UniProtKB/Swiss-Prot annotation:
One cellular component term from this protein's GO annotations in UniProt: small ribosomal subunit
One matching Pfam family: Ribosomal_S16
UniProt-recorded name of the protein: Small ribosomal subunit protein bS16
Domain of life: Bacteria
Gene that encodes the chain: rpsP
InterPro entries per the UniProt record, alphabetical: Ribosomal_bS16, Ribosomal_bS16_dom_sf
Homology family: Belongs to the bacterial ribosomal protein bS16 family.
């Protein structure tokens, strides 16, 4: 089972809010997930990115692949180099 760390869209139309989740790569974007490890709100100034660092590092160590966007956010937060 290929596991990915990715964003799940929430919020209203034209007001996105995302949850950072760990999910099987074959499940739909807003479908079933394994764990929720944080949130991302791009509408705030500056953007609010909150994530459980320990959980993120654990999932990365276990082989979960972050998406491009999550990788960029992790680098900005100092979780990944």
């Amino acid at each position: 089972m290929a596991v990915k760390i990715r964003l799940k869209r929430m919020g209203q139309k034209k007001a996105p809010f995302y949850r950072v989740i760990v999910a099987d790569s074959r499940s739909p974007r807003d479908g079933k997930f394994i764990a929720e490890i944080g949130t991302y709100d791009p509408t705030q100034e500056p953007s609010a990115f909150n994530v459980d660092e320990e959980a993120a590092k654990k999932w990365l160590a276990d082989g979960a692949q972050p998406t491009e966007t999550i990788n960029r956010l992790f680098k900005k937060a100092g979780i990944v180099k």
